[in-house]
Amino acid sequence: MTSRSATATARTSSEARAVARTQTLIKGEHGIGTVRRTTLPGGLRIVTETLPSVRSATFGIWAHVGSRDETPALNGATHYLEHLLFKGTRKRSALDISSAIDAVGGEMNAFTAKEYTCYYARVLDTDLPLAIDVVCDMLTGSLIQEEDVDVERGAILEEIAMTEDDPGDCVHDLFAHTMFGDNALGRPVLGTVDTVNALTADRIRRFYRKHYDPTHLVVAAAGNVDHNKVVRQVRAAFEKSGALKDPAAQPLAPRAGRRTVRAAGRVELIGRKTEQAHVILGMPGLARTDERRWAMGVLNTALGGGMSSRLFQEVREKRGLAYSVYSYTSGFADCGLFGVYAGCRPSQVHDVLKICRDELDHVAEHGLTDDEIGRAVGQLQGSTVLGLEDTGALMNRIGKSELCWGEQMSVDDMLARIASVTPDDVRAVARDVLGRRPSLSVIGPLKDKQASRLHDAVA
């Protein structure tokens, strides 16, 4: 028999869990740049960044699901679902959804990545309640009807065809496959013609129910927003939908993942009749939680992050071998990529690859000059600040930070971390990352003799 005091204690404990928890994560001056987080009963997190001086606001909902979470048979399901959430809810048609935001001059969109999905709307601050209502309705009330699945299949197949027609885009999918193979990280976010054709409404509904629980979601809003008002409206929308049914549920922790990069030295070529050959030479990089990522950012900027970078100067400015040449990094939960892209005439592929490989090897052995590091630090700091000048970028930053790291970092702290990078830090990460044996992906009209020599670039 349960005692009265025990029952009261249990009720008190349950009520305590049901109370929303609010924290100030970054305290801005005079409220400008203040970031707050509220965790609702049911595990839904809401983060906001307040900028009273602007007239706009961006509202988004991030889902802890990407193409990495798909089985081979479900490849493309995350992106397919992203499309379907715009097709109608219990109270809005697809036209109602789009016209609501169009009517106030706003913009609305979504994107799917390998480890997350985001739906967002950018509007005037006075129209923020509308944006919240529409986006929350999409996430909690979508119908995912058979006829919509059939119609949207055609649009997605055209999107796949459009990507295939752009070798400069397609080569990045090829490089992911070169590095990760048939692992989910190596498969295209859009899926393939075969997998998209095989997906059914029932399978997509099951995928939706599994991955769009409130514990898997992060709500983010930035601009001229009132945190408490955003929380009240979001909570009302999710409670009305019945989504917050378990008050004791806790938010999903940031993804841990598992290392999946394949052995180095792989070469993949897709022969295609194009004017240019598109190449990516790269190797395993750093996970997004790796503390060396700040030094890696400086290294990447100096190597191929701008017109003064080594690769741009050597490949384009001095020799005119390519119009587009750059380096980039991609960080996932447990692994990463570093790549160098170039588009060039097929006859000059080997020259371009040799120059790029020589530069990577030289920097791996000798590092960068102090002047290069200083310039890269300044460039990275400036681009970081300039990249956060609109509310959409701010919403992306706080939403992704909450989902992927479970914490927030102020812009000042980010700039300080970049400034703290030393030449020794850069040399160490260059030896580690650039010292690894590279792999190579190529799309273009290479002849047999040219193709047979591609392995020289990764030897």
UniProtKB/Swiss-Prot annotation:
Cofactor(s) for this UniProt protein: Zn(2+)
Query: Which InterPro entries does the record associate with it?
Result: Metalloenz_LuxS/M16, MPP/UQCRC_Complex, Pept_M16_N, Pept_M16_Zn_BS, Peptidase_M16_C
Which superkingdom heads the taxonomic lineage of this protein's source?
Answer: Bacteria
> Which residues are the active-site ones?
E82 (proton acceptor)
| Name of one Pfam family that matches | Peptidase_M16_C
Q: Name one GO biological process term.
A: proteolysis
Per the record, the similarity remark reads:
Belongs to the peptidase M16 family.
For this entry, the protein name equals Uncharacterized zinc protease SCO5738
Q: What is the lineage of its organism?
A: Bacteria, Bacillati, Actinomycetota, Actinomycetes, Kitasatosporales
